[in-house]
Amino acid sequence: MAACAGGPGSWSENILKYFLRNNQITAEDGAEILWSHAANHKSQMNEALKSAAHMIEADVLLPSDGSEHGQPIMAHPPETSSDNTLQEWLAEVVKSNKGIKLDFKSLAAVRASMLFLDNMKQHLQRPVWINADILPGPNGSSKVVDAKAFLDTVTSFFPDVTFSLGWTTGWHPEKVNEGYSWSMVKEMDYICSELTQPVTFPVRAALVRQSCPQLLWLLTKSNRYSLTVWTGKDDIYSTEDLLYIRDYFNKTQVFYDISEPQNHEFKQAIGIRGHSLRI
């Protein structure tokens, strides 16, 4: 299927083209993009906004206790409260030139969040990524966000958004950890082949090296597809693993939302200076 990345300022604009156009990166290389992770509470959000990050990632949920009058809030489970609502978060982030990635752990907050985003759309002339884990993945839980309901709800508001669609995963230091299987990538492609938007697949750094053939197959299925390599807090993986991944895939198709010290070591090894950041 042909690429459907949007034009300048659209929510589906390729983030490399967006940040190149704004002179914030120097090459079409996914490793140049800096991430600020879990910018949920006001202090975290403010730190992210002041940072050199290009993309701000935050987590959205609906309070189960009925607080905030049913408004979506910015928090990552197991947290269920926050000093920041999505409405307040958007009002601050819109003043910046940063791209946005919103992560949903359940369907509950999706529709209400799309309504707030819709109200801000004319002020958000930048890439917007909407993320959910829609399939069970390696060592992961079967508790996923319903793919059809999620995609239908988001697309009904924003046919031009960029989707970030992942698998639930686990990683255990004492066990053999399975990678992304052929059935996992084929099921993901089956779902995404019906879409016209760009899709990035968040993949867990510690599981990627052993899954490179499967993930490369997935990327070859559409030029709308990319990978976003992320890491769990206690995962064990090496800079060599990241360099292997970088050599295996096209540099324009892989982003790295990874933690320290590997992030700094990786950027140093590939000659990208001043890019030690993952809040």
Swiss-Prot record:
InterPro entries: Memorin. One of its GO terms (biological process) is photoreceptor cell development. Pfam families: Menorin. It comes from the Eukaryota. Disruption phenotype: Mice show a degenerative retinal phenotype at week 15, characterized by patchy pigmentation of the retina. They have no photoreceptor function from eye opening. During development of the eye the correct number of cells are produced and the layers of the retina differentiate normally. However, after eye opening at P14, eyes exhibit signs of retinal stress and rapidly lose photoreceptor cells. PANTHER family: MENORIN (DENDRITIC BRANCHING PROTEIN), PROTEIN FAM151B. Essential for survival of retinal photoreceptor cells. Belongs to the menorin family. This is Protein FAM151B. It comes from Mus musculus.
